[in-house]
Amino acid sequence: MLSIANKVIVKHAVTKIRYGDVLLTYGSSLAVEMILLHAHELGKQFRVVIVDSRPKLRGQQLLRRLVEKGLNCTYTHINAVSYIMHEVSRVFLGAESILSNGTVYSRVGTASVAMVAHASRVPVIVCCEAYKFHERVQLDSICSNELGDPDAISSVQGRVDVNHLDGWSDIENLQLLNLIYDAMPSDYVSMIVTDYGMVPPTSVPVIVREYGREQVWL
């Protein structure tokens, strides 16, 4: 069922890629990866900008796979996203979940990328399967989130000289906050591509309702 949903998403989303586009994505999303690879197989000429962030650096895995397939890629970190955004024609993002008010729940940093794109008048296209749509409403990433290992942000892998936070847990008035997800406002989203087609964020409640009915009948 998942593969069918992804195939439908790819079929719709690939129509939004044009000759000479510069497409930006953040981290690593299976749906976005499938879209980019399919567009490349169709012979479309475009460049991919992969924006990444510590500590997981999942964008490096996506970068490696795309380069191996022959795609033209640029890799940078999230602190340079405002600099590179002026080159971008479209932003493709994945999502962990889309809530009924249109909020996109995704890897931390996604909202920042979308905010810069919105300010730069660059369309933001979110690719997400319908089973990830949720009736819950959330306005920020603080009221509900997942905490990662704080030690993951206290050091830099391979850099023993970066040790300024060694022993941080012994400091009573210091806390390290490693949030896993963030909440992207629907205002930053130009379009959501799902297995129900391409829809605006305002259509999310309809999809949540219809998908729920389908599951009841199944």
Regions found by a protein language model. Give the residues of each.
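Non-catalytic, soluble scaffold/interaction modules
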Residues: 1-4, 26, 144-150
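Short amphipathic alpha-helical molecular recognition features
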Residues: 1-2, 24, 54, 80
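A short, well-structured juxtamembrane/interface segment
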Residues: 2-18
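Short secondary-structure boundary/capping elements
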Residues: 4-9, 27, 31, 76, ...
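Intrinsically disordered, low-complexity regulatory regions enriched in Ser/Pro/Gly/Thr
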Residues: 16-24, 84-88
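Short, surface-exposed connector motifs at secondary-structure boundaries
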Residues: 17-21, 42-47
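Gly/Ser/Thr-rich loops at beta-strand to alpha-helix junctions
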Residues: 22-33, 55
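Conserved phosphate- and dinucleotide-binding cores of soluble alpha/beta proteins
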Residues: 34, 39-45, 51-218
